[in-house]
Amino acid sequence: MAVNYLQYIGFVQQGGVTFPNVRFLVSGVDSKVRQIVGQNIVSSAYDRGKTLFVVDNTQSYNAMQTGFGRYQVVNALNGEVSLCNDLLNVNSLKSISRLRSLLSDLGFDGTRAMKIVTYLNFVKETQCRLGDSTALTIDILEQYGSMILVEWKLKQLVETGSLSEENYRYLMGRYSEVSGAASDFETFLVLLSPFLGNTQPTPSMAVHLPVGEFASDKPMQEMLSKLLISYIKQNISNATVLILDDGNGEDRKFIIDILKNIPVSSEVHMLSNDAFTLGEADRSILMNVFPIRIYTRHENMTSCGRIECLCGQIDVVKHSSTVTIDKRFRANSAWDMLLGTNRTETSIANAPTKEYRFRKEIINTMYDGTGIIDYAGNKVMFSF
């Protein structure tokens, strides 16, 4: 009976293979192998009740030819799902730390980040004084978008006796201190608005993050990756991340950011047309993040050469032989010719020489459905 790639990996592991314990990297243009591995990843995640996050670094939704099975696919950019609906709640050190971390990743320094936290607390406190204790939303923050609006709200509290003139002046002073940061934050919220909805990701949902559509807008790609990392850190056991990569360009910083910052215990996989077009430092990160690597046919000979080196060398012993024939008349009697005693055969085993296990020419011309499985120090050619 033929052995499939999961059985082989399980054998190498000396135990049954399960997706939570491994991370897969598939690199190459072979759509058959990519589809087989991708569908197994998707099916396993669905059966275990995981929300699937698809980081799609391609120019086309169908470019990677990976089906999503029974998952309901939703586009995160359409506001169909919330990745940070509690981002505006700064009522605990943990939530404040999360917001500060996200703001720092997006270019806000520590002082400005704390002014934004102070601003959100100011809005929350004022809303509570007005009798509204619900969670903060973008709509509520818009009501505090200018000095005139804030002054009007606080005057209401003074008129109803809920706020003294002294506290009124104090709060207006506080607002003037943080209003500059508040203005910057509101601009930032315009980008965040699609991810601040009320619909939480569910186990039957595949959240599509089309980062490839923002190839010319690197900050937008980085913001999407930061939001994803922030969400995964809060929901490690409930999510699977699948990165689809077209393999174009040496600088794919947002992918490396995800791989470097995502929790070690989280589940992440990557299917790429060519992961070896990344720079040397980034390739080193890939090798560390993904213990199971599958290399299929690559069109870029430079990438083929890198895989050739990665798979290492083996000792090859080459044999040579010579035949010396005695053409003297006396050595060519019928008996000599019949018994072969008119010739001398010499076989020589040369000293071992180093050769690449898989030459780049082979990697460049591999058959469809064939790949090299690189796992636990073993590198074998495998038919899928």
Regions found by a protein language model. Give the residues of each.
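Residue-level detector of flexible, active-site-proximal loop/helix-junction positions
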Residues: N78-E80, A275, N300
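P-loop NTPase motor core of the ASCE superfamily
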Residues: F108-M114, G279-F384
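Structural recognition of the beta-strand scaffold that forms the well-ordered cores
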Residues: H269-M270, Y295
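Conserved H-loop
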Residues: M270-L278
